[in-house]
Amino acid sequence: MKIIKRNGAEVGFDITKIIIAITKANESVEEVDRMTPVQIQRIAESVELQCQKMNRAPTVEEIQDMVEHYIMAHGAFEVAKHYITYRYTRSLVRKSNTTDDKILSLIECNNEEAKQENSNKNPVVNSTQRDYMAGEVSRDLSERILLPQDIVEAHREGIIHFHDSDYYAQHMHNCDLVNLEDMLQNGTVITGTLIEKPHSFATACNIATQIVAQVASNQYGGQSISLTHLAPFVQVSRDKIRASVRDEFDTVGVAVTEDQINSIAEKRLREEIRRGVQTIQYQVVTLLTTNGQAPFVTVFMYLGEAKNQQEKDDLALIIEETLLQRYQGVKNEKGVWVTPAFPKLIYVLEEDNIREGSKYWELTKLAAKCTAKRMVPDYISEKKMLELKVDKNGNGHCYPCMGCRSFLTPYVDENGQPKYYGRFNQGVVTVNLPDIALSSGGNIEKFWRIFDERMELCHRALLCRHERLKGTLSDAAPILWQYGACARLKKGETIDKLLYGGYSTISLGYAGLYECVKYMTGKSHTDPSATPFALEIMQYMNTACKKWKEEHNIDFSLYGTPLESTTYKFAKCLQKRFGIIEGVTDKSYITNSYHVHVTEEINAFDKLRFEAQFQHLSPGGAISYVEVPNMQQNLEAVLQVMRFIYDNIIYAELNTKSDYCQVCGWDGEIDIVEEDGKLIWRCPKCGNTDQDKMNVARRTCGYIGTQFWNQGRTQEIKERVLHL
C-alpha cells in the first residue's frame, strides 16, 4: 500500500511511523493519562485497515486525521491534545518554508501528484519542470497573499475549484478564438519581427503555427483556429503555380493549352497543401511552449464559413488532407504510427455534408473513418448551433469552442455585426455539487440555502479572476492584445474594454450533477422522476449567472467543467468530509458536469438525447461523448451516430482506444489492473507495465491525453461502459 507525502511523493505505508508518533505523544502526558502499547498497536492497525479500504493512496494529512479520531475514540484525550499540538507545531514550521519541499520533489521527479496532474505534460522534462516550479511559486503567492482566505480554504477543501491558480499571479486569461484571418490578411508582429501577408498556402501554414505557439505561451487555456482562414491562400498558391508552369513551358518553347497548365498546377497545388497541413500537424505536436507542453489547440473545419464557392472547394481540399494525415497518425520513437493528442479537430456537420449524396458527403465519410481510428474529429451540429446560439438580433450562429469545450456566448459588435474570432474567456471557478448535497444532509430547504451560499462564494472568486485581469496593459502579451490574436490595442492601453459588455466571458463551472441528484433523490438523474430536479439545479445556476451579468456588465456563463486531475481531488475531499456513501462517494472520481455516470448502462442515442437538454443549459460550454468499441469495420454505425448528433445535440465526440506496446508490438487495448492497491497500465500480451514503453491515448476531458492520469481519472477510465 502506498501513501502520498505532503510534497506529493509516493512512498510505501509504514505502520511503525504511526506507532512512533502516537508513542511520542503518549510519553509526553502524565502516566495516569497514558495508553497501553496494545492500545497504540490497535490504533495503528485500525488506521492501516481504514487506508486499505480507501482503494487509493491516502495522504499524510488524512492518516493523521484518522490517528486523531482513533486516539479520541479510545478516550485518551490528553494524548490526543499533545498529538494535535505537535502536528500544529510542525505545520507552522512547514508554512515558514511553503514551497521548498514541493519544488525539490519536482526536480527529483518523485512528486506523484505532479506526474499525474496533466495528461499532456511530461514532468520529467526540464521545460515542464520549470513551468511546474513557477506554478508552485504562483500558487503559493496566490494562496498566501492575493486571494481571500475563505476562497483559498474552500478551494483546499474541494468545496469549489479555483482553476489554474498556478497562473493566477500573472495577468493571464484562459482561452480564446484566435483571429487568424486578421493576422494573416493584415500582418502581425512576432517577437518584434513584422510578419506580412503570406504569398503562399505553405507560408500561411507556417505562420499559423508560429502564432499558435506565441498565443499558447501567453495564456493558460486552449485556443482554436479555423482552416477557413487559411483557405484564401490556396488560390494565392494556385495563381502563383500556374504562372510558374506557364513560364516553364515558355522557357523551353513548348506550346500547351490552359487545361494542361491547370492540370499540372493542380497536382503541384495538392502537394503544397499536403506540405502545409503536415507543417501544422508536426509543428503543433513538437513545439513546446513556456507552459512546458504542446499548445492546446483546436482546428475548426467548417465549410459554411467560406465566403464563396471557390473558397469552399479549396477549404474542402484542406479538410480532406487534414483528415488523411490524422488518420495516418504520427510516428513514435519506434517508428510506429500512433495517435497524436494535438491538434484537436472539430468537423461541422451541415446540410452540404451530412446526407448521402450531398456535395461533401465523401469528406464526412473520411471524417468517420478518422474518428474510428484516431478519436478525432469531434462533431458540431450546424443545425443545433443555429437553433440555440442566437444573438440579440435573432440570428443564429455556428462557431468553434475555445480549445476543448468553452463556448463564447453570441455577441454583436457596435456595427451590428456578429463577432467570435478575437474573443476570449477570463477564467473559471467550479462548484462541487455533491458537496452541497452532502452538506445539506438531504434536507431540500437546507440544500437551496447552502446552494445560495456556494453561488455567492463562486461569484466572489470569479470577480477575483476578473479583477486580476483588469488594468492589464496590452504590452503584457503583444501577440494577443496588440497584433491581432484577440485585439489591436495601442501600446500602453489597458485591455479593460474587452472585459465588459459581452466581448469576453467568465465561467461558472459545475461538476458532479449525477452524484448530487443521486444523494438528494436516491436515483440517477436519468430517472424520469429525478430529471426535473437535475434540470432545476441547472436553471438555478443559469439564473445566478444572469443576475451577476446584469449587476456587473460581465458575461458570466455556465460551463460544464472537464475535471481532469480535479475529479480525484474532489472525490478525496468528499470522502474525508462525509465518509464513504454508496453511489455517491464510493469512487475515486466524481462525474464530469452533467454526464451520465460512466458505469450506467445506456445506449449511445439515448445518452446523447438525454444529455442534449443539459448541454443547452450550459451556454458557457460543454461536450457529450459516447464510448464505443473498435468501429473501423463498422463505419456505417459511426455515420449513424454522426447523423444523430446533427439532428439532436450541439457538440459531441466518440471515444475509442488507441494503444501500442513498444515492448511486444501489441496494438490492441492496454489493460488497467490493480497492483499493490494502485491502478496501473499493463500490456495484456507481454505484461509490460513501464509507461515509458507504451503509447496510450484516451479521451480525458475533451482533449486526448497521452501522458497518463491520476488514480481517480484512471479508475473512471477503467469503469467506462460501452454505449454501442
Describe the role of every protein-language-model region:
Residues 1-109, 718-723:
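Charged, amphipathic alpha-helical regulatory modules used
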Residues 15-19, 75-78, 307-315, 521-524, ...:
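Short amphipathic alpha-helical segments with coiled-coil-like heptad repeat character
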Residues 23, 459, 463, 514-518:
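Amphipathic, well-packed alpha-helical segments that form the structural scaffold of globular domains
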Residues 89-502, 523, 527-689, 695:
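Conserved catalytic cores of very large enzyme subunits
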Residues 273-277, 281, 519, 713-719:
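Metallocofactor- and cofactor-centric catalytic cores in central/energy metabolism, strongly enriched
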Residues 301, 506-519, 539, 699:
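Contiguous, well-ordered alpha-helical segments that form the cores/surfaces of helical PPI scaffolds
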Residues 685-724:
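Long insertion/accessory domains within large nucleic-acid-processing enzymes
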